[in-house]
């Protein structure tokens, strides 16, 4: 009240009024600017004049019991005056110092857990090595990069549910934790943060950093993985770069890297199978990366790479609308075109049918090591501005653009026949034929393209047919720029369709991706990739195929045995035997198969000649299309370890060795598993298999008529009983089952029951 009175007195003096109204501060706009809203408009100034006051801080009244009125030096720490307009106390900055030195301490055990991202960053920087600084022009291009090392890949919604569950478990609201990763993280974090005293909001913020991928569109010249991006400000400026090796890897970068390798391997393998799309899906669903299902990673991980995007398209996920050609990502920035089939003649007079894009279009092309802007009309390159790390990278971009332009002089530059094939030995489409041809050798293409004199434009120079720079002349329409072309920034995803040959199209039918675009680069994955699919057995070479095939037969012996006796054709066609065929010499495949199938048929016909070990050993050979011949073999050859090795039809060999005592099989010295049944009692195995669908009731019962042969059993009605002759002339009583459900267990129980019935 005192002050208000004082103000009234001041205002009544004309001089005060004059100062306040005539000086420039009386701009309503300025007054509004500094007084409206809660947001501080000049924080630095505010801080300065606040700190000049004796008691700039307010605190809860309880502070008076927790802090003495004066410190050791006798300075006052808080004032008895109340803060105007609240019931808080005015406190000196010295009180903060006192609190930090003498205040209560809490347990620090949770700090490293809550602030994990920061603690880990410090470790990475501590162990990282910074190299020399180089001054040079930096070709930076904006790319979408991950700025948050060490995160899981949950969606914002999934992360929100996890955070609520961990930090505010008693809050109301439906939370559904479905994915495996959500459940694991929630459990782990709840345990870590028991009795945590850190403010829940802070914990929530830090959890978000750990769970969600954060991306930014930043200018980058070097590495794009998150451990490089976190030190971007230290490693590259406008005209300098500093070498840096991170002091540790983070799982999210490893996941991205391993995902790309797995996807490439899977697409390459699927391409050569009979039904590429079905095979690809089967492999994606049965593969794990670092212990997490690949399909879960694909759903969450935004990595854009050709093979990864093909896998995503196969799973029905949306992908980026840009398309890929020659390893470059093309994004149309303006113009439009219609497509028309046209026949063209190469320099070798070979006819090619190409889909011509008619119309004016502009594209950005972004590759790993070069970028470009391309302007083209119908079968004509108008302008190409390219920038890249080195001569080689620039040349790659120029070749791709020249082929993409579909110009006649490019097609006429073809020397020799075009007959490139993919991994499945199918001819590539004409555009990829041309691309492969010129990627092998582009001399004629560059020589025939033509050159033109150039104007002096800032930041641009010419490039000659031999790929040397020039300021006078350049390849027609082509210029090299110092500046990179930014990657397409939008994160928009579109619905796509995929055909069985793995060609991905947008809704207008434009091909965005095809297996030809998948890089052949081999790398070593950072995380363990576990391919459970038989199609990937061969990725580790012939030995792995051999061991895996036999392991598979042993693991599935119960079902295999039944199929062997009842539906062999279906068994021979199983995809698990496909990889094995590549080990059998081509010339012998059909003869081996015919021989083994005949042998198996004799076993089925003549009861008692059933030999489990021999069936397992020879089964993979029967999968090839058989050739009918009278040939007999005592050993079969497989190509492993760089030469042919023999598998003996009767008896053990280094390739296939069954130890009767331990009942274990070793293939090429590697353990392939144990046989659960006794091979000597194999006859019972077959009969029980043949008696599938019948219940063995006991010894022969004369009331049910003479003993039938196994083949005559099929005429029985459900629930009907009959005597049947099995094995070495024994007769047992059986009943045809009323239900088909328990068929599989029959073969196991039958073995025991036959023994009981006979004995």
From Swiss-Prot:
UniProt keyword terms in alphabetical order: Cap snatching, Eukaryotic host gene expression shutoff by virus, Eukaryotic host transcription shutoff by virus, Host gene expression shutoff by virus, Host mitochondrion, Host nucleus, Host-virus interaction, Inhibition of host innate immune response by virus, Inhibition of host MAVS by virus, Inhibition of host RLR pathway by virus, Inhibition of host RNA polymerase II by virus, mRNA capping, mRNA processing, Viral immunoevasion, Viral transcription, Virion
Pfam families (UniProt xref): Flu_PB2_1st, Flu_PB2_2nd, Flu_PB2_3rd, Flu_PB2_4th, Flu_PB2_5th, Flu_PB2_6th, Flu_PB2_7th
Marked site, Mammalian adaptation, at 627
Which InterPro entries did the record assign? Flu_PB2_2nd, Flu_PB2_6th, Flu_PB2_C, Flu_PB2_CAP-bd, Flu_PB2_middle, Flu_PB2_N, INV_PB2, PB2_helical
Q: Give a GO molecular function annotation for the protein.
A: RNA-directed RNA polymerase activity
Chief location bin: virion
Q: Does the keyword Signal apply?
A: no
Sorted alphabetically, the Gene Ontology BP terms of this entry are: 7-methylguanosine mRNA capping; cap snatching; DNA-templated transcription; symbiont-mediated suppression of host cytoplasmic pattern recognition receptor signaling pathway via inhibition of MAVS activity; symbiont-mediated suppression of host gene expression; symbiont-mediated suppression of host mRNA transcription via inhibition of RNA polymerase II activity; viral RNA genome replication
Which interval of the chain is the signal sequence?
A: none
One GO cellular component, as annotated: host cell mitochondrion
- Please indicate the residue ranges that the annotation assigns to the motif Nuclear localization signal: 736-739
Q: Where in the cell is it found?
A: Virion; Host nucleus; Host mitochondrion
Function noted in UniProt: Plays an essential role in transcription initiation and cap-stealing mechanism, in which cellular capped pre-mRNAs are used to generate primers for viral transcription. Recognizes and binds the 7-methylguanosine-containing cap of the target pre-RNA which is subsequently cleaved after 10-13 nucleotides by the viral protein PA. Plays a role in the initiation of the viral genome replication and modulates the activity of the ribonucleoprotein (RNP) complex.
By sequence similarity, the record places it as follows: Belongs to the influenza viruses PB2 family.
Q: How does it assemble?
A: Influenza RNA polymerase is composed of three subunits: PB1, PB2 and PA. Interacts (via N-terminus) with PB1 (via C-terminus). Interacts with nucleoprotein NP (via N-terminus). Interacts (via N-terminus) with host MAVS (via N-terminus); this interaction inhibits host innate immune response.
- Name of the molecule in the record: Polymerase basic protein 2
What organism, scientifically named, is this protein from? Influenza A virus (strain A/Duck/Germany/1949 H10N7)
Source organism lineage?
A: Viruses, Riboviria, Orthornavirae, Negarnaviricota, Polyploviricotina
* Protein's gene: PB2
